[in-house]
């Protein structure tokens, strides 16, 4: 959990033990992603359904990075073969069963409910999280663009058309695929 104040930052992880490195990596990278997104938010409230999806995908991307570079990590001296545990942890997350909440969301009211419950009901966004993770893997140099999302926020939705028109980048086009297609919003 990320706690911010005027002069300090505190991150609390809920891991059974600090040597469960895969979970520590996942949770810490998740909270650091929140921190970066909030630093670029201009004081605006976060768009929970979108931000949680981004941060979960980022955590998976960082797990992949640690798996690929484990030999370079000082922790590998304690357990050289732990890279396989990181890989399994990542695969288990990726292959999680998911609901269809975000994909089947058709109204602003449904999206507000889903957003409010987004931290608790993560399974409703797993499909979208995996899409974003795959986008991150295919376009790693463009990941930094996610910090711009608040500029294109329009209440509970993101104006991807404006973002795409301004950025003219395939990364934003791909990212827009996870946005619910609401009936009452153009």
Residue spans for each PLM region:
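Hydrophobic (often cysteine-bearing) scaffold residues that line and stabilize catalytic clefts
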Residues: 25, 47, 51, 124, ...
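Active-site recognition of the HExxH zinc-binding catalytic motif
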Residues: 25-42, 52, 56, 60
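Structured segments of extracytoplasmic/periplasmic soluble domains
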Residues: 35-39, 57-69, 134-139, 178-181, ...
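Short alpha-helical hairpin
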Residues: 1-8
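Pan-zinc metallopeptidase signature
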Residues: 96-186
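Post-HExxH zinc-binding segment in Zn-dependent metallohydrolases
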Residues: 47-95
């Amino acid at each position: 959990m990320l706690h911010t104040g005027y002069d300090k930052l505190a991150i609390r992880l809920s891991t059974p033990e600090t040597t469960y490195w895969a979970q520590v990596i996942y949770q810490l990278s998740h909270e650091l992603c929140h921190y970066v997104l909030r630093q670029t938010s201009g004081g605006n409230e976060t768009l929970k359904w979108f931000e949680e999806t981004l941060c979960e995908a980022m955590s998976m991307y960082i797990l992949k990075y640690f798996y690929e570079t484990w030999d370079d990590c000082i922790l590998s001296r304690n357990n050289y073969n732990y890279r396989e545990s990181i890989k399994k942890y990542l695969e288990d997350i990726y292959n999680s069963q998911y609901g269809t909440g975000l994909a089947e969301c058709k109204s602003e009211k449904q999206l507000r409910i889903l957003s409010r419950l987004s931290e608790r009901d993560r399974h409703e966004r797993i499909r979208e999280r995996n899409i974003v993770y795959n986008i991150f893997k295919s376009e790693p140099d463009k990941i930094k663009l996610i910090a711009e999302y608040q500029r294109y926020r329009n209440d509970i939705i993101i104006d991807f058309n404006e973002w795409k028109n301004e950025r003219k980048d395939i990364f934003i086009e791909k990212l827009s695929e996870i946005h619910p297609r609401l009936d009452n919003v153009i």
